[in-house]
Amino acid sequence: MLMTGSVGDGSEFDWEDQKTFISRDGGLTWRFVHNSSGLYATGDLGNIIVYIPYDPEEDGDFQSEFYYSLDQGRTWNEYELTNAISSVHPYKLINPTPDGSGSKFIFKGTFATTDSETNSITSLKGVEYIIDFSAAFDSRTCEEEDFEDWDLADGKCVNGAKYKYRRRKQDAQCLVKKAFKDLSLDETPCNSCGESDYECSFEFVRDANGLCIPDYNLIAFSNICDKSKDKSVLVEPLQLIKGDECKTPMKIEPVDIPCDEIPEEGSSDREIVTTENKFDFEIKFYQYFDTVADESLVMLNSIGDAYISHDGGQTIKRFDTNGEKIVEVVFNPYFNSSAYLFGSKGNIFSTHDRGHSFMIAKLPEARQLGMPLDFSAKAQDTFIYYGGKNCESILSPECHAVAYLTKDGGETFTEMLDNAIHCEFAGTLFEYPSNEEMVMCQVKKKSSETRSLVSSIDFFQGDNKIIFENIIGYLSTGGYIIVAVPHEDNELRAYVTIDGTEFAEAKFPYGQDVSKQEAFTILGSEKGSIFLHLATNLESGHDFGNLLKSNSNGTSFVTLEHAVNRNTFGYVDFEKVQGLEGIIITNIVSNREKVGENKEDEQLKTKITFNDGSDWNFLKPPKKDSEGKKFPCDSVSLDKCSLHLHGYTERKDIRDTYSSGSALGMMFGVGNVGDKLLPYEECSTFLTTDGGETWTEVKKGPHQWEYGDHGGVLVLVPENAETDSISYSTDFGKTWKDYKFCGDKVLVKDIITVPRDSALRFLLFGEAKNMGSGSFRTYTIDFRNIFERQCEFDITGKKRADFKYSPLGSRTGCLFGHQTEFLRKTDEKCFIGNIPLSEFSRNVKNCSCTRQDFECDYNFYKASDGTCKLVKGLSSANGADICKKEPDLIEYYDSSGYRKIPLSTCKGGLKLDAHLAPHPCPGKEKAFREKYSINTGAYALVFVTILLVIFFAAWFVYDRGIRRNGGFSRFEEIRLGDDGLIENNRTDRVVNIIVRLGLCISLITKSAFQRTKAGVARFSSKLRARFGNRKGPTYSSLLQGQFSDESDGLHEDANDLSSFTSQDSNFEIEQEDAYRPEQEHTSQIDQPATSNIPDALPARSAIHKPDSTAVRNEDE
């Protein structure tokens, strides 16, 4: 194995000091490979190793090279890419053979092209190489004598056995050239067992010295004292590791455990453990580190004292800052073990191990402005700090912000850019950045009222490019950067980039409710789309707007829902359900017209979508409340009686979301059942376990909630009311129990747990009024003892009944083009633990496309019948715009009115987004004609060739079968079967057969025609005889009068048909079950045209053909 690292005590880490090492004994010993970090890959089962440094210039020259070893890393050879472009920076090195047995490698990299005059980088280009070692050692294949036995762990016992493995000798001059097979180990059990063969027994845990000591919580859980009548019990602290194969067990001295110190078995309340901590000052800030290693968190009180806990708040230690108060705590959003505490005296305390240790550094000599840090997504120690320069006072004329850059976690800072108030490491955010070193900054000069957006690829040491001269602000989300730019008439425009270089204006749909683009809120992005709220009413206290969604590059938006509620600060009642695709909950203003006219206050209703905004429905209310009383919604439609929930705009803490990413399908909400949303204090608490399809009222009144053990434990606590109890459920909300956690009632301000909602400990922050000092308290409530065991995890969901794959709710059909099943716990008596359960789902099958897999395209709206129609007075998106973005294209297509939802993976089926006729891109007309024009020369040659063949065949038959036998005149005398024809050889016989066959067909056709003609004449004669005495126009007058009018009518019908076939499609579709593609092309023109011919029309006129025949005749 190859690894990148450094030699030291582990207290410091420097990316620039990383080296590469190799081990060929499973990590037991290591050898130095190279004095740099880079990419590496192996081939031929480890007998070929390739290493490429990240920096091609680390060896002092500009020429790119790679290093390889053919003796398992003992010696290395350098290979210069002599014909290559210099300074190729690698980003991928792979062995394309999946099992690593191949001898070929693919190396991909990038190189920069520079301006010869300024020596500045003009562009980045990619390059790819294939490295082939198949001819190494003169293509010799290894034989049996080239292999050796290798002892795992240097021949020591591992899990009670010694193992050997067959591999190629290190100095063998050959390649194995065989596909990888599962390891075939020679296993020999060890005679005696050692300490490495043992682990702590269930009732014990290891201390800091590695000794197994009793854990009384686990002892109570194991019930060992219940099986003993004595006051103590002897328990062995060690047990043999399961699967260990050593033969002779080690002698273990048991430990005497006093049973009177163990809690007796009783109710569930007595199994739950509560730990209380008191504080003299209120805890204002608290946040967990988002890791699975432990339950570490940082807390900060109102006077600047910081506290650290590593067990979910059970034991809390005050952080020693040597008297310095902490003014701010910032967590690194990209590296979950890192946090920074800013001191009031200019010190910064940083930790990279969840608060177990801290490093102290000095901030730049600048005034702390309280601006948030901006971090690099790829370098843990790189971030930007904002300080005030020349700031004796914030109001000083010379006071301005400066962006300071650190690359060593705050040990040293360099001044990066004056007047910068917000920067982003843009190059680390994009999937395909134009330059990974790019930094973008918003600059606000005190002498100017405007803000500009600038970028640099060298931290503004020399490169400083102005992107926009005047902006309102910008932000990044999901691989996009969106910039708000002021426009004329107090409007805004949004510009989007996905690489940091090319910016495109975001096109918002127009409508009657969108008069001006004055404000918008970016709601986030997910899987190729940006969600955005465009304000349509900015009356204070009555704000609302349209919910929009973009295409994959964020430039074209469509309207998903109208009148979505927002507040004055721009927050929107919009929330995506975590862990599930395409489920969104919003609150809409149902009386928007009257609100816009200031005639009524807002009336909010809650809506939900299960297909990413294409279709919306009101929440289905439960039939009964938590007391068993029926809701009055049985015979009322959902638009008049449904469930409504208070949303994002009313939250005290934005971290308190409806759902949890680990408790799949579960959501809590405070709301009511009725025709509109009631005030918060009049509402109750509701729960869904199937992603919002069905809901249950679980408690009267508003409650705070929290999820534990991936939803295996649910906890509720009353909101805005003093209490001494919580309610909890261990069966996914089916039943609830109350637990008293304290003696005196307190006002619980918040309840939290780890961000992954996987822990069994909950932390409550409460305030006990009228109790003097120590009135601010935390309560850690531990549910670890209420479960019998930990669930046995099986990714297949088959071996045990603890987990199984199942669909969510009743949605067994397709959603986003596939059927998905989730791995969920089935046994309520076990706990899940830190297993990332939300990551385990499977697609049962992909589905055919249906209407639900499409949404309306730009400037199209969804009509009441479900079809997408063009907004009156507007046009669809200009398809030619794509030609500007992709210069290599020669054609574009007009919109069909539909576009596929980015989340959908459907294949086949309905194709509502099918392209219409192509159009040439501007300037590409010639290439377009060449692509679609017919090659007339080739077709003419084929046509002439066919005519010549037919003419030659006809002439040959005439010459050999007709002319030589006397010409056409003789055939009037020849009967079939006559032997008078000349037949000298086989060719003559074949020709004469053809002639006889033609004569036979001619005679039959002639006879049939004569019989038909005679029959028609007899039938016509009978009709004239029957109707000849009736009054009416003569046959000749019909021909000269009315029939000429009918002919004109047929001519008009032909014109109508032409206009019909040229009409555009209205994009409407029938219901899915009734959809038949072939019916769309079924015309009604094959029905006979109505006629004004009177009853006296002679019989022959009855055979006039319908309009469609007339059209064909006229065309002929």
Swiss-Prot record:
Transmembrane portions of the chain: 934-957
Glycosylation site positions: 35, 336, 553, 846, 985
Pfam family, one: Sortilin_C
Organism superkingdom: Eukaryota
Keyword Glycoprotein among UniProt keywords: yes
Polar residues composition bias: residue spans: 1084-1093
Biased composition (Basic and acidic residues): 1073-1083
GO biological process: Golgi to endosome transport; Golgi to vacuole transport; protein targeting to vacuole
Keyword Transferase: no
Ranges occupied by BNR repeats: 21-32, 67-78, 307-318, 404-415, 607-618, 686-697, 727-738
InterPro entries linked: Sortilin_C, Sortilin_N, VPS10, VPS10-sortilin, WD40/YVTN_repeat-like_dom_sf
Keywords: Glycoprotein, Membrane, Repeat, Transmembrane, Transmembrane helix
Disordered as annotated region, ranges: 1069-1116
Cellular compartments annotated: Membrane
Primary location recorded for the protein, binned into one broad class: membrane
Topology with respect to the bilayer: Single-pass membrane protein
Database matches in SUPFAM superfamilies: Oligoxyloglucan reducing end-specific cellobiohydrolase
GO cellular component, one term: Golgi apparatus
Protein name (database record): Uncharacterized membrane glycoprotein YNR065C
Highest classification ranks of the organism: Eukaryota, Fungi, Dikarya, Ascomycota, Saccharomycotina
